[in-house]
Curated annotation (Swiss-Prot):
<dbReference type="InterPro" id="IPR002735">
    <property type="entry name" value="Transl_init_fac_IF2/IF5_dom"/>
</dbReference>
<dbReference type="GO" id="GO:0005850">
    <property type="term" value="C:eukaryotic translation initiation factor 2 complex"/>
</dbReference>
<feature type="compositionally biased region" description="Low complexity">
    <location>
        <begin position="109"/>
        <end position="125"/>
    </location>
</feature>
<protein>
    <recommendedName>
        <fullName>Eukaryotic translation initiation factor 2 subunit 2</fullName>
    </recommendedName>
</protein>
<dbReference type="GO" id="GO:0003743">
    <property type="term" value="F:translation initiation factor activity"/>
</dbReference>
<keyword id="KW-0396">Initiation factor</keyword>
<dbReference type="InterPro" id="IPR016190">
    <property type="entry name" value="Transl_init_fac_IF2/IF5_Zn-bd"/>
</dbReference>
<comment type="subunit">
    <text>Eukaryotic translation initiation factor 2 eIF2 is a heterotrimeric complex composed of an alpha, a beta and a gamma subunit.</text>
</comment>
<keyword id="KW-0862">Zinc</keyword>
<feature type="region of interest" description="Disordered">
    <location>
        <begin position="1"/>
        <end position="146"/>
    </location>
</feature>
<keyword id="KW-0479">Metal-binding</keyword>
<dbReference type="GO" id="GO:0031369">
    <property type="term" value="F:translation initiation factor binding"/>
</dbReference>
<keyword id="KW-0863">Zinc-finger</keyword>
<comment type="similarity">
    <text>Belongs to the eIF-2-beta/eIF-5 family.</text>
</comment>
<dbReference type="GO" id="GO:0008270">
    <property type="term" value="F:zinc ion binding"/>
</dbReference>
<dbReference type="GO" id="GO:0001731">
    <property type="term" value="P:formation of translation preinitiation complex"/>
</dbReference>
<keyword id="KW-0648">Protein biosynthesis</keyword>
């Protein structure tokens, strides 16, 4: 094997091997251990003596403070501060001498630092009691930020300052409650589910079709044209105002069709209110909302499935 091949082969690192300890080195280590023990014991005794001295100084300071507090507070407040400063100064000198850093004790009369924390702006309305004359004061609202303003008034009127988040949110809810309370309330408008039954093997009857059209405030012809277009079939209305649909359909399928019809032709896309009206203008249908007065055009319903008749025979020339 050549020299170049020996260099490429992995070789153990000799520095990582453990060296054998001689007898002389073992004796030296024992002597060093004894010296370290003696040094540590001396250091421990010094620290105990220093701790006792510090405790004695603290007791003397406490006695001086108690004696000074017994006299007038105004005259002796400066003397107390001097004693505290002297004690802190002595501790700093001792810490520097020993090479140890000690934390300074905060005085009880130090200025309190104000910590800012993010808090949610919640409004707490407080109603005032009526006065002796019988006139009740105006309702004031206080927020967690400390802002106070009278209900029904604009606090930034006549000023050039920026709006506050709490003021704007309060104004939004106040206007909604005054103009459209249905949007704030948790009440939900409910509608009866469709009552679907089968008649024979090829027909499905929707029993409460006329009732659902009344709750949606839409014409019967407009609704069943949409139903036939979505289901891809046709049908008619019998004498009991029931919708007869050709084919076999489940209740879940009818419910999906009703939801699509409500989202497209009943519900307002701005305020989600069902209080809307369909108006026709120049062959186009417009959905007008009575709550927010918005207006949008809706798609024309395509016709449902139509039966294909026989083609007329071509004329022979």
């Amino acid at each position: 094997m050549s020299a170049t091949e020996e260099e490429n082969v992995l070789v153990f690192d000799t520095t990582m091997k453990k060296k054998k300890k001689s007898k002389d080195s073992a004796a030296q280590t024992e002597e060093e251990k004894k010296k370290l023990k003696s040094k540590t014991l001396a250091m421990m005794s010094q620290q105990e003596d220093e701790q006792e001295q510090e405790d004695e100084k603290k007791e003397k300071r406490k006695k001086k403070k108690a004696a000074l507090l017994a006299s007038t507070e105004g005259e002796n407040s400066e003397a107390i501060e001097k004693l505290e400063n002297e004690g802190a100064h002595d501790e700093d000198i001792e810490a520097e001498f020993m090479g140890e850093k000690k934390k300074k004790k905060k005085s009880s009369k130090s200025s309190t630092t104000t910590t800012t924390s993010t808090t949610t702006t919640t409004t707490e309305p407080t109603e005032t009691e009526p006065t002796e004359d019988g006139e009740s004061k105006e309702k004031t609202i206080t927020t967690s930020d400390g802002d106070t303003f009278v209900q029904g008034t604009i606090p930034w009127a006549g000023t050039d300052r920026d709006y506050k988040y709490s003021e704007l949110t309060y104004r939004i809810y106040h206007l909604l409650q005054a103009n459209n309370p249905d949007l704030i309330s948790d009440q939900k408008r409910t509608m009866k589910p469709p009552q679907v039954m089968r008649e024979g093997t090829k027909k499905t009857i929707w029993a409460n079709f006329a009732e659902i059209c009344g709750t949606l405030n839409r014409k019967v012809e407009h609704v069943y044209n949409y139903v036939f277009a979505e289901l891809g079939t046709n049908g008619s209305i019998d004498g009991n105002q029931r919708l007869v649909i050709r084919g076999r359909f489940k209740t879940s399928q009818i419910e999906i069709v009703i939801r699509h019809y409500i989202s497209e032709y009943v519900a307002c896309r701005n305020c989600k209110s069902p209080n809307t009206v369909l108006e026709r203008n120049n062959r186009l249908y417009f959905l007008c909302c009575n709550a927010c007065n918005s207006k949008r055009s809706v798609a024309v319903i395509k016709k449902g499935l139509e039966g294909a008749g026989k083609k007329a025979p071509k004329e022979q020339s």
